[in-house]
């Protein structure tokens, strides 16, 4: 089928516009997702460093637990931070009061200091496992996690909006 000149120009314009809009939508989605992940990862790193300073490295427990618990009770937290301490044998030696009877899962196959998504009580969390070393000897791990559900809902909603609005643009 041979198309006339005007039809070919219109078709090329239509396809080019569709590709450009798709690229813009992809950039918006990827930018937002990356920003959310970087923000959560930054918060997790900060919390890990703070709690690492409060750690009794010989016993792998929080050094001043009473003060730590008081601070946790005084703060109103929208995104609570979960902290768990493991010894070198991956046994729990201490954990934050907000974990109650729950525990954060240790993933031995996961690389150290890499942030990843997992679940706690069937709820989405973002977690990082950092080794605790003294003079190069592994003493244990500090696991820090935060809820990721609200952030994931935002990412999912944006994707849905972009997919629905793409055909109309």
Regions found by a protein language model. Name each.
Residues 15-20, 160, 164-168:
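Hydrophobic alpha-helical transmembrane segments of multipass membrane transporters and ion channels
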